[in-house]
């Protein structure tokens, strides 16, 4: 990219979405994101856009001076609709720092889908990093952050994330 890149986030869990007036369900949010990316990337490419979709109707939209170079689209998600949006529209597919086999399976599937569309993506991993002068100091901070969190609380947090629709 150039001076700006964008990380597209389709949304979080259903309750969070409703707080902001968004009542579109998980899969339809990804359909809406696909439409948005179809329109915005065509605009960035300098096209005058006419578009009629389920969520957007655009008549003759254009950007007088499209960004140069075009912003790079970063996109992540683990659900089937997310993988399809990534394959169709992202330049960089992002995944969490999951076990290598889990991340590898997702990346392989996104790459396969992108290839069927004549596209090749780049890949990134999102991690939380604790940086200190020494490894021992970093581990002390990590241990302090994790102190007092039970295995049950960790399991509950994973279950909540899994049920959230943020995939």
Protein language model annotation of sequence segments:
Residues 1-3, 87-88, 112-118:
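Acidic (Asp/Glu)-rich catalytic clusters
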Residues 65, 87-93:
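Short, surface-exposed connector motifs at secondary-structure boundaries
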Residues 75-85:
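Short, acidic/polar
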């Amino acid at each position: 990219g150039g001076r700006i890149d964008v990380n597209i986030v389709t949304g979080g869990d259903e309750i969070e979405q409703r707080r902001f007036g968004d009542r579109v369900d998980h899969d339809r949010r990804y359909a809406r994101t696909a439409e948005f990316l179809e329109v915005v990337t065509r605009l960035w490419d300098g096209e005058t856009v006419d578009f009629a979709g389920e969520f957007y109707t655009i008549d003759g939209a254009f950007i007088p001076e499209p960004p140069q170079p075009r912003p790079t689209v970063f996109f992540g998600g683990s659900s089937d609709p997310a993988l399809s949006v990534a394959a169709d529209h992202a330049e960089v597919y992002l995944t969490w720092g999951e076990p290598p086999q889990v991340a590898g399976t997702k990346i392989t599937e996104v790459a396969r889908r992108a290839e069927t569309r004549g596209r090749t993506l780049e890949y990134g991993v999102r991690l939380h990093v604790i940086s200190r002068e020494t490894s021992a100091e970093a581990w002390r901070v990590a241990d302090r952050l994790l102190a007092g969190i039970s295995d049950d609380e960790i399991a509950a947090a994973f279950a909540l994330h899994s049920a959230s629709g943020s995939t």
